[in-house]
């Protein structure tokens, strides 16, 4: 009887038991530090729903989701203070990584990346974080909160100096001064072949974090902090496809700041779902 029913509350084709899964999806419905328009807490389920409108096969990568072993644990159960919530994210992420499974996370706002990276730090002595984003996210604090989504890469920088920031076109003077003073690898353009070759030469584990607002609002209106003069969907995908050369080094990724209440015809959620599909086909 069960074969006649479908569970649309999970990412498409996420039918593998956790014990057998090589990749683990979960979402973090958290947006308490959003600095402009809240709503990213609903992003994970919007991405899941949108995934069912896509094909399982990628003609670019010549792979099909049906070939992969991954599960979807749905929403992480969150309660308590921000510190307690981040502690939960950290411990869950660490347990998944300890089992040599790839981690696939849907936000939620961008602050949730920090406790995930703390878990990465627990497992790997040295690693790389690649960020696609419109914003530096390098503030030391925002409205008195050092764990704000505006501070996430500043906190990550305290864990690893190997951060690569692409698509950045917004931030306050303090952030840009910090980047220049410390010679951070921060570019307004998307990652190109030369960038990838340098990353490849470092030969370290890689975690990828994608803030959907790296795209121009015309392509991704469903986000809480839209930033004009961004990139097209095709430009972003062409950059992401370069990661295939380091796919064996990628230990996980997140897609954050999808806020469906501001979306138009679900184009932001659909784009996020396709990003997830392509990266999963690449790394699993």
Curated annotation (Swiss-Prot):
<protein>
    <recommendedName>
        <fullName>Agmatinase</fullName>
        <ecNumber>3.5.3.11</ecNumber>
    </recommendedName>
</protein>
<feature type="binding site">
    <location>
        <position position="211"/>
    </location>
    <ligand>
        <name>Fe cation 1</name>
    </ligand>
</feature>
<feature type="binding site">
    <location>
        <position position="151"/>
    </location>
    <ligand>
        <name>Fe cation 2</name>
    </ligand>
</feature>
<comment type="function">
    <text>Catalyzes the formation of putrescine from agmatine.</text>
</comment>
<keyword id="KW-0479">Metal-binding</keyword>
<feature type="binding site">
    <location>
        <position position="71"/>
    </location>
    <ligand>
        <name>Fe cation 1</name>
    </ligand>
</feature>
<feature type="binding site">
    <location>
        <position position="213"/>
    </location>
    <ligand>
        <name>Fe cation 2</name>
    </ligand>
</feature>
<comment type="similarity">
    <text>Belongs to the arginase family. Agmatinase subfamily.</text>
</comment>
<dbReference type="InterPro" id="IPR005925">
    <property type="entry name" value="Agmatinase-rel"/>
</dbReference>
<dbReference type="Pfam" id="PF00491">
    <property type="entry name" value="Arginase"/>
</dbReference>
<dbReference type="InterPro" id="IPR023696">
    <property type="entry name" value="Ureohydrolase_dom_sf"/>
</dbReference>
<feature type="binding site">
    <location>
        <position position="110"/>
    </location>
    <ligand>
        <name>Fe cation 1</name>
    </ligand>
</feature>
<comment type="pathway">
    <text>Amine and polyamine biosynthesis; putrescine biosynthesis via agmatine pathway; putrescine from agmatine: step 1/1.</text>
</comment>
<feature type="binding site">
    <location>
        <position position="137"/>
    </location>
    <ligand>
        <name>Fe cation 1</name>
    </ligand>
</feature>
<dbReference type="GO" id="GO:0046872">
    <property type="term" value="F:metal ion binding"/>
</dbReference>
<keyword id="KW-0408">Iron</keyword>
<feature type="binding site">
    <location>
        <position position="133"/>
    </location>
    <ligand>
        <name>Fe cation 2</name>
    </ligand>
</feature>
<keyword id="KW-0661">Putrescine biosynthesis</keyword>
<dbReference type="InterPro" id="IPR006035">
    <property type="entry name" value="Ureohydrolase"/>
</dbReference>
<dbReference type="InterPro" id="IPR020855">
    <property type="entry name" value="Ureohydrolase_Mn_BS"/>
</dbReference>
<dbReference type="GO" id="GO:0033389">
    <property type="term" value="P:putrescine biosynthetic process from arginine, via agmatine"/>
</dbReference>
<dbReference type="GO" id="GO:0008783">
    <property type="term" value="F:agmatinase activity"/>
</dbReference>
<feature type="binding site">
    <location>
        <position position="133"/>
    </location>
    <ligand>
        <name>Fe cation 1</name>
    </ligand>
</feature>
<feature type="binding site">
    <location>
        <position position="211"/>
    </location>
    <ligand>
        <name>Fe cation 2</name>
    </ligand>
</feature>
<feature type="binding site">
    <location>
        <position position="135"/>
    </location>
    <ligand>
        <name>Fe cation 2</name>
    </ligand>
</feature>
<keyword id="KW-0378">Hydrolase</keyword>
<comment type="subunit">
    <text>Forms multimers.</text>
</comment>
